[in-house]
Amino acid sequence: MLNREEKMKKILGIALGLSVVLTGCSKPEAPAADAAKTDTAAAEQTVTIASTGSDADIWRHIATLPETKAAGLKLDIKNFTDYVAMNTAVANNEVDVNAFQSYAYLVAYNEANTAKIAPLSTTYLEPMGIYSSKVKTLAEFKNGATIAIPNDGANESRALLLLQSAGLVKLKNDFDFVKGTSKDIVENNKALVIKPIQMATAVRVKDEVDAIVLGNTLAMEGGLNVLKDAIYYEPIDQTTKMNINVLAVAEARQNDPVLKKVGELYHVASVGKYVQEHFGGTKIDVNKPVSYLTQAK
């Protein structure tokens, strides 16, 4: 027969066993699916992108893609109208990335500012073109014809290089692709009048001159397709690699793994299809390492 102490031990053992069984059968506090959702939400990282015009449209589209969600990213697109302000915002970490500029423009910004920015990745090249409502070919330009070009730093230099590529002028051998101006023209056989203007006045001025050099964004806003409407446009080769557009970040964040994912998103197939459908082939995809650009300096 069991004594009193042994009976108590047996009762406690049975009680503990029942406790384990009941605990094992109890309902979990949160279903596994809910926990997974919580983990996914926690892992999603918001990246702010400063952009403008057609670039902003592209990034708003990218923000909706399943590839963006799969990368664990949420893109917040901020609209800007001032180019310098977009670079300043990136340099000061007020936004994470900006999307609007060529590599040449980025270099020019860094030369003029203390807080530096850096290319994160390449995106596309938009050829700059020469447009005219008065002539249909380069050969038709008369002596003394006036050609309007952008007056803003790197774009002015780029326009002059385009005129040289077209055979209309010749520039000095050490022409600066960032700071070059019309003063650097050493040969101008047709005595062309090169007129730097503010691009904000381009639409008004277009019919007042014999021709105008436009970047693709302004051309598209005016209903022009550089591949169809320009009488001449930039070749896509080693001579124009500085004109490739880039995503820009603060210099210290150039190798940020989260931001690198943003650069990769631009080159997914569905983005290429969207760009082709909406911009008539005028934004030519360039998926090159950043080193491809820096070697061009």
What are these regions (language model features)?
Residues 77-88, 176-204:
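Short helix-initiation/N-cap motifs at beta->coil->alpha
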Residues 156-164, 265-287:
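Periplasmic-binding protein-like
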Residues 54-55, 81-83, 93, 97-107, ...:
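Beta->alpha turn/N-cap motifs
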Residues 24-35:
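Bacterial lipoprotein signal-peptidase II cleavage site
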Residues 108-120, 133-135, 208, 213, ...:
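Ligand-binding "clamshell"
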Residues 120-169, 272:
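A conserved helix-loop-strand patch within extracytoplasmic ligand-binding domains
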Residues 46-76, 85, 89:
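Short, polar/charged alpha-helical segment
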Residues 127-138, 243-258:
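A bilobed periplasmic-binding-protein/Venus flytrap-type ligand-binding module shared by bacterial periplasmic
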